[in-house]
Structures are given as structure tokens and as C-alpha cells.
Amino acid sequence: MSKKRLHEIAKEIGKTSKEVVEQAQSLGLPVKSHASSVEENDATRIVESFSSSKTKAPTNSVQTNQGVKTESKTVETKQGLSDDKPSTQPVAKPKPQSRNFKAEREARAKAEAEKRQHNGDHRKNNRHNDTRSDDRRHQGQKRSNGNRNDNRQGQQNNRNKNDGRYADHKQKPQTRPQQPAGNRIDFKARAAALKAEQNAEYSRHSEQRFREEQEAKRQAAKEQELAKAAALKAQEEAQKAKEKLASKPVAKVKEIVNKVAATPSQTADSRRKKQTRSDKSRQFSNENEDGQKQTKNKKNWNNQNQVRNQRNSNWNHNKKNKKGKTNGAPKPVTERKFHELPKEFEYTEGMTVAEIAKRIKREPAEIVKKLFMMGVMATQNQSLDGDTIELLMVDYGIEAHAKVEVDEADIERFFADEDYLNPDNLTERPPVVTIMGHVDHGKTTLLDTLRNSRVATGEAGGITQHIGAYQIEEAGKKITFLDTPGHAAFTSMRARGASVTDITILIVAADDGVMPQTVEAINHSKAAGVPIIVAINKIDKPGANPERVISELAEHGVISTAWGGESEFVEISAKFGKNIQELLETVLLVAEMEELKADADVRAIGTVIEARLDKGKGAVATLLVQQGTLNVQDPIVVGNTFGRVRAMTNDLGRRVKVAGPSTPVSITGLNEAPMAGDHFAVYADEKAARAAGEERAKRALLKQRQNTQRVSLENLFDTLKAGEVKSVNVIIKADVQGSVEALAASLLKIDVEGVKVNVVHSAVGAINESDVTLAEASNAVIIGFNVRPTPQARQQADADDVEIRQHSIIYKVIEEVEEAMKGKLDPEYQEKILGEAIIRETFKVSKVGTIGGFMVINGKVTRDSSVRVIRDGVVIFDGKLASLKHYKDDVKEVGNAQEGGLMIENYNDLKEDDTIEAYIMEEIKRK
């Protein structure tokens, strides 16, 4: 059974949807709104309920009532025609009676049919008469289509005109019976108006689509002409290229040229022959000028959804066009351009076939085929080695060369690359002077005199612990001085000082002469190729002998210019400032002869002089700028770390923003403290600096892991033997990185047989809680050099029983660690004979054992001594005494020529005349 919606039932019986919904709900039907559906029998019940709810009147009464209404209307009409005055007679209102809806619907339908027929004839006449001009035809069409227009005023005008015409001829047809006054909705009229509006809208859209199709056809024709012209031009160019390459033995190029010349026109023609389904289905040739179809399939355009779906339908699913858009003419196929092969090809190891094809502008399939002919099986995503790439390029006739890749993480390339500096921008720079010499020969005193400060008095034990970089000005020119330690432990720091210096001042005490560190400084300077200026210090002291110093230095290859050598000698007294001016003039003279120059326009490069950790500032590094200019906020890579220059201070502690060549500065902003002697370089941006720093740190870690010794069959015995060696674990914390290195190197050089030093951890900064935790876990001793533990670290060390040793002089640390190493060894014992006794008689006691009566013949016998039982010159037993008595008393010892009794633990086989030898094991102190 079919179903009906409530709004359709309301439309049929002339009721509102709300009334129908309420009536259906009162009948017990499960409906919610006017869109709810009911069965056909339920729909009949609803209609009958409306009919039965009102009192039915007889048919004749209805007819009589209709007759009265018609008659009254006729009378009123006649009165209106004959007399314009309003009637004074009161009109009686008809009593409300039951309505016959079926009769009313039939009457309305009949009236509408007659009206449509009459208006249709009138429309035909108007259309025939108004085809002479466009404007008049438009007006006639507007009048003829009045019944389709949703303009109720126009319908009323047509109705009034028809009424007047029929009134003149006295042939007015019977009108439908007058209905009682009320605002009823004329659904038929509204449906007719909606149909008219839809038809008009479709007509407008049809005309617009027709015009668009015509424009698209004209555009397609124009594009076809352009495509033909382009194809002819491409054929001519291909023919020229073919003639140009005819002399070259490249078969594949000929095939490609022929394909390119023959392909475009055929492809374009075949594609143009295709017609879309929408063009086939819509034949606009059958439409008239107004865009309305005269024949073919007439679809029911009254359904609004059908109209919308027809407008927005997409019949050709193969075309990726948007809905509602007509498919234009297909685009002509552009022909493939022919590209010349490059003359040179720069490749990198591991390039894929697809990358090579893109670079030389060839198809990957072509390269795969060539490789197959060469005996190499490859796909377009497969990597090729350098030899294969070169063979492939030879086959194409291209010169191939490998690309030189620059390692961005390599800082050393800036120092080795001569092209890094611009020769036109080289200017004179201040010399970098390093002061070297033996301990207490006056290096820091000389530097102190030069700077007019009292730094030297603050050195612990008279030893400079780390490099100091200072800059002074003499005769309008600047000189940079580096002060290096003289102790033997600081060999690496002296070597670093020689590597970054331009001139070496070798200071030798006139009363002390050449010492081991003096010779070492000479060797460092010669290895670096640095000129040496000898300053003979302490000439004011009694016993000073400069001539002896000159002769001793000549034995080591440092010859004075007075003796025909190359080294300048100046006799000074650093304490009293004697001949200091002459020494500075000599430095400037040697610097002028060396022609020291630098390029201040490049990005800065240089060397780390010293590095430390500051509690408030973090990592602080003392840098010596060798080339370029260092600015604040420059991204920088220092050793295996990176950062941005947050702040710069000079040797006087003042903030500076720019540091030129040969300028020492201290910077902050690094993520961790670098190693002294590391090189640094400024990068273009922070991203590049970060990448280079992280890569260098990764390489350093990998190198450290590679240096780890692994156990193998060859070194298995050595490893087991090394496990027997005892070790002293130490944790080193110092104020500067150079002191950390020197202290660690010195401790590792301590030679105590059977014991070695194991540096568990070494760093710059104060002793903190993590150091104490590490020392507890590794059973290590913490050595603090010029640093103090934090209060929290000290409390934790006391609680965990961790030993912290604090020092300020390096040789004190070495002595203390050496003592600890000696105490770590197992003690050595030496046997000491106390005395001898002879067994005179034996006594066997049950449940006790054998008691030997003895007499001491030499030395003494003690209670805690060990004894040997010797019989006939052979040791029978070696053990401990269980008891020792003199007569009946227990005694600790029995002296010479005395008698006593003894028992030996776990031994009862004593016999007369056995010799008892008493001895102890005495510890020997290591030297």
C-alpha cells in the first residue's frame, strides 16, 4: 500500500497542515509533523474525520444556498452597473452551513480549465501579432504567459479584462459560487505560479547555456589554430635540431627527435575527435532563439528538485570538472621540448638514476636501458657509485667530475685555506708575544712591570698557574703578551702558547742559568718557527753572570746577533724596571721585520687561550683573535661546543663590542666550557653554528669510543695481568682548563710499581654535589685545585665519608697522590727470628695434648710469635703457639737461658731434642 504525507492530505481537503496533524494525533496515529507519512486507509480515516466532525446539510439546501449566493451576486452586479450609489438595503448574512468540499473542488477545477483555455487562445493571437519586433514580441509573450507568472496582480488584471469583454457581449460564463469572506490560500494558483516561475527560469538558463556553448566552440576553434601553428613551428625546430646533431654519433638523440617531431599533431587530433557525453546529450540545434526546446523529450520541469539536479548534474565522469560547469573544449597537447645535453656534469657519490635523469634532462627509462647495455642492473631509485656515473657520462659524451664537498664542521679549513683572506684587505696587526722560561725566573714579574700591576704577588708558591693574556701600548703600537707557566707540569700549555705566538721572549735568570724548562721553551719555539728574544733577568743580583747564560744558550742553538746569530739578547731587571723600554723596542723591531698582517673584514677565527666555568656567567673562554673581527652576538663554534657571543671583556675587565686581530678577549655565551688550545670560528648564522658544533661533538664522542681498548685473544693475558694492578681513583676539579690538563697529566706520570692513577672525572668549576656522588660510587678522592666545595657538597661529603683534598700548588698534589698510591699497595713483610729453644722433655695430657718443656738457648720466645719445629735440620711443622708458661704462670715471653712450657696449635708430635725457632713477620716500609 502506498503512503501519503500529511501536508498532501491537507492540500487535498483544503486544510492547514497543523489542523491535519492535530486531527491525526487525535485519532491515535503516530505522527509528529506535516512531513510524517500514513497508510492509505489512515489517510481515508483522517479525511472522513474532518467530514464527520461537521453537521452535514441536505444537498438541496446547498444548492439553494448556492442559488441565493449567485442571485445575490447578480443583483449586486446589476445594481453596480445601473447605479453607482451604494445600496442602503441591509444585506442579510448567510448562516454558517456545512460545506461540500468535493463540489467546491470540482467547480474550481472547471473554472480554472476554462480560464486556461481562454487565455491560451488569447496568447496565440498575441504571439502571432507581436512577432514583428523584439520589444513587442517580448510584451506579447509577457501577456500570453500571464497565467504562468507569479504575479497575482497581473492575473487579476487579466480576469478584469475578460469580465469586461464578456459583459459587453452578454455572454459571461457561469462563475463559481461565491464563498464566504475569509483569507483562504489558493493552492492551485500558487502551484501554477510556481510552475510559471520555474519555466521562465529554465528558459533564461537555457539561453545562457546556449551562448556559453557557442563561445566555447569559438574558443576551441581558435585554440586548435594556435596548436596547429605551434606544431608546425615545433616540427621546424626539430628538423633544425636533427640536422645540427646529424654529425654526432648519438643514435638515441635521433630517435627522440623523430618521436618529438611526429607525436604532437597525432595526439592533438585524436584528442580533439573525442566528444563529451554532455555535448552528445544536449543538442542545442533543436532550440529556438529563446533557448526553449520545441521537440524531443519534454521533461516534467514542475518538480523543483528535478530542475536543480538537471542543472547541477555531471554526466561525464571521466572529466574532472566541477558540478554545474559545462565541459569546454579539450586542451591541445603540448609537444615535448628537446633539451641539449650539458657539456659538464658534477656528480656526488650515491646519486640515483632519477637524479641523474633530472640533471641531464633525459628520461629515467633511457638511462636504465643504457646501464643495462653496460651490464649494470639498476632501477630509477637505485644509487650509483662514482665509476658507474662516469662511464654513463662517457656514453653520453659528457665530461664528468666529482663534486668537492666542503665539511662545514671542519674549523681547521679556515686556518689552512689561503683563499679565506683577501690580499687587498691585509693590514698591519699587533704582534703576539709569549713569555717563556723556567720556574721563578721572573716571567710574571716582567709582565707585571709591563702592565704596572701587582699580579705576580698573588701567585701561590710563586708559580703561574694558567695563561694570562694582556695587551699594552708602546709608541702608539699595541703588543699582546701571553704569560705561560714555567712548571714542568704545564708543558702542554707552553706548547699552546708557542703555537699562537709571533715572538717568544725567553727569560733566563742571570744567577741560575739554563734550566730544563728553558730548554723545553727553546724547543717549542723552534718547532713553531717563532723568533726568540732572550731577556737575561735578575742582573741586579749578586752573582749574576750574563756571559755564562749566553754561552749556555749557544749550546742549545740560541745564538746572539753579537755572535753572528739571529736572536736578540737584552739584559733586564724586571723587579726594578731596568732596560724594559729597550726590550719593548726590540719586540716592535722584530715584529716589523716579520711583517705581521691580518684581514679584519673576514669572519673571526682564532685560538682558545683558557677556559673556565663561572658560577654566575657559566662557561667563560679567553680567546685570541688571529684573523677577522669578533663582534657581540656573533654565532661561534669553539672546539666541540657552540654558542653566541653574549658579552666580551678585555684584559682590563671592561666590556667591549668589537675585537680585532691579535686582541685577547673573554667571552660568555657558550653552552659548555671548551678545551684550552681549541680553535674557534664565527659562522654566518646560528643554525649553521649549531649544526657544526653538534657534528664536532658527535665526532669527538665517536673518536673517544674508538680509543676504548677491547679484550681480544692477543691481549687477553695483558688484560688479566692489568686487573691485578691496583688503582687510585681521583676526581680533579680546577679553576681553569689548563690546570685540569696539567694536573691530570702529572698524576698519570707518577710511577709506583703495582699502582696506577685513574682519573674518573676532570672538569672546571667548584666541587658540587654530583662530584661527591660520583666519588662515593667510584671510591675516589676529590682533588680541588684553586676551587672550594659548595656547602651542600661539603655536607654530603661528610655524610658519605668522601675525602676532599684542596690544593693551590701543583707539586703538593703530586706528592700527596704518590703517598696514597704507595699506601694502596699490599704491605711487604720480612721474617725476623726472635730466638731458639730446645725441647728437654714432653708431657702428654689427656684431652689437652702434648706439652713440651723447653729451654731458651738464644734470644727469646714470645706468646704472639710463630714457631717452627725443626728435627734433624728439617722443618717438620710451622704454626702458632697455643700457650706459653713459665713454671705454672702464663707469660708473654720467656727470655734467654730460661725454662718454660709450651703447646703448639694443632700439633702434638713433639719429641725431645726438637729445635723450636720463634719468629715474627715485620712490615717493610716502601721507599
Swiss-Prot record:
Residues 146-159, 300-316 have a biased composition (Low complexity). It is found in: Cytoplasm. Residues 573-575 are annotated as: G5. Residues 428-597 form the tr-type G domain. PANTHER family: TR-TYPE G DOMAIN-CONTAINING PROTEIN (PTHR43381:SF5), TRANSLATION INITIATION FACTOR IF-2-RELATED (PTHR43381). Residues 27-338 are annotated as: Disordered. Residues 70-86, 101-138, 160-171, 202-226, 234-257 have a biased composition (Basic and acidic residues). One of the essential components for the initiation of protein synthesis. Protects formylmethionyl-tRNA from spontaneous hydrolysis and promotes its binding to the 30S ribosomal subunits. Also involved in the hydrolysis of GTP during the formation of the 70S ribosomal complex. This is Translation initiation factor IF-2. Its main location: cytoplasm. Residues 49-69 have a biased composition (Polar residues).
